């Protein structure tokens, strides 16, 4: 078998058809094979991540936090640059764009070849970067100073940068090729408004690549020179600013999200048009919705940076601009549903993946509305809520669309047909697996669990084990997928319709149509196996739900109910109360939208499913709901312009309706969002100022204006009896010695011109006392008074950190060279915990925040006694 494999590899590299090919179909096939290989690597990385997070403590990585950081970095790079982009743009784009526009090939065939062959060495460099010294553990954002020569002194980050450069050049060359091909090589008569929607999506994606990738190239080149040539673009010690890198990166990074999802939109449009036996509803609206998404995608980049210290007006602008993207996205969702309504729905594997895409992408988009609010994002930034959001958009958006397109075009590409039953098994396993993996992440994110950590407090255990179990199901679905391909190529089931694979579209090349691929070869076969399988899975899902509800109800009887917490931590500041109230307000509207989308999909499927295109569809069924609505009010749909009468067709009217309605919903969401945002920015004259400094191992705190605050400003003289009990306690602890506690009440603090400074380290698990919380207990907590206006000044001494306490509603980045500030007004006493939520090296999971909120009557005296005992005063 090994000799056979070596012979195949040798023949591959000596066969000019593949190595030096200029045929767009062969190059597209190479992209698909390369993307599949990269997808396996990325899936393995994701499985390692989920196995490590299956339980608290070290599971499979032996406590190597840097290795965990390297794996999450490689997982993101591989999935984005070497799986989704190659298969969606390079694979399907190369295969079908020339065919859909009637072109003999791409405009620059040799350029097409080199654009592919830049990807394997790029992937090789990325994988090598993981093996050089300790690897590149920077996250896919590669933020400095963590990516600087001080924090990553080896060549790993340099290799990762070179890998990104090669992948970027490959994408730029491909984008130029697609733009030239689509503009110059269409058959005569095929205008831009007659292009298939998949071609439009690839064209818009190519422009996004052309405008965004040079910015990324500039950012990582400046980072490279900072690391190796002593420049200081992002080094605060030399006058640079690490936030500049974030602006440059996200100017590329957010359009990159639409680079990944726009080809998916095109694929979904093709499949829905085919399997509903209808043309796409609102074609022009769909095109301009994609154009609007592309334009808006360039002006919303800073919604990834709400916590870095942007002023309130800037955050308000990016909140509004980000919300606007929901309008064209909603147009596309409802246009797809309108296409299905009134059609002749054929239930095949591609359509199953498309319906799954519609439901799950809608859910991911709605959580994006939540995160677009600068006020809410303060609580959710860099938590697993964000991870859940973008995986619902990508893992269940782009990837589901890829599988839909793969099954849809499989026989057109390979000449073989796949087993429909295994295709359905693949869909259901993947649908269940990805939901079980990512839906619980919303709950741990709301509870404040930081992302990109290899270890977590025990309270997050149950949701994480559920996510890890879901990832195993998803991996099984991938195995089923590759087994399906194996069966397709080894069962000799070539359909009779296909004579020559590479000339399959020849009879259709010059057909002037909005969609050259609306034809389909769907056999009229029995679906009995599918129905049996569907019944089994429905029974399985219902049984699993019943068992889960029963198990959850049993958990309510013991002490572990907090581990299944599905909401925010208990608030203790007015800001935290406001954030939770705003979240509930927004969630109501989003739940209604999700219900409407789900109801429309289910009712459409129930009403218009006919099993096969060969069945006759009663004419009464072809009248859509939207036609009925419009015909009712047809008399009111005309208007005069310059003495001419124009009738608004049903597509335009409906699109106007579902453009205005989402805009009104966004308005209802935006008004309280802006009110909360500006309220959060108000800093009342503080009684106490605390400076917070982040380090890679610990936090430092300074009561910087302690010397000007006197204890008797805040005393409640009716509470003197409490001090008698406190005095006995302190004397028992050896703090007061011979002095009375009451002597501290009536005289100013005896520490004029003194600033209290102390460091706060995590207490390791072996040193914890009974009842202490693992990963959250510190040796020196921060003391803050209740019902007092407090100002926090936050900065960093080395890399980026984030001071985040969920119960306070506070999350502020600690940036070297900057001094960010926020205000606190604490309403409850108690002990509150938080963690650093920014990736800051190997110690990311080991920088807890412990805050004691005490009664102001006791605060100054208690602080003085406590720190005097540790010789800090």
From Swiss-Prot:
Residue location of crosslink 1'-histidyl-3'-tyrosine (His-Tyr): 254-258
Family matches, as Pfam families: COX1, COX2, COX2_TM
Cofactor dependence: heme; Cu cation
Binding-site residues for Mg(2+), renumbered to this chain: 381-382
Residue ranges of the TM segments: 29-49, 70-90, 91-111, 114-134, 159-179, 197-217, 248-268, 280-300, 323-343, 351-371, 390-410, 427-447, 469-489, 536-556, 585-605, 656-676, 845-865
Entry's EC annotation: 7.1.1.9
NCBIfam families named among the record's database cross-references: CoxB (TIGR02866)
UniProt similarity note: In the N-terminal section; belongs to the heme-copper respiratory oxidase family.
Protein name, as recorded: Cytochrome c oxidase subunit 1+2
Originating species: Acanthamoeba castellanii
Taxon lineage: Eukaryota, Amoebozoa, Discosea, Longamoebia, Centramoebida
Gene: COX1/2
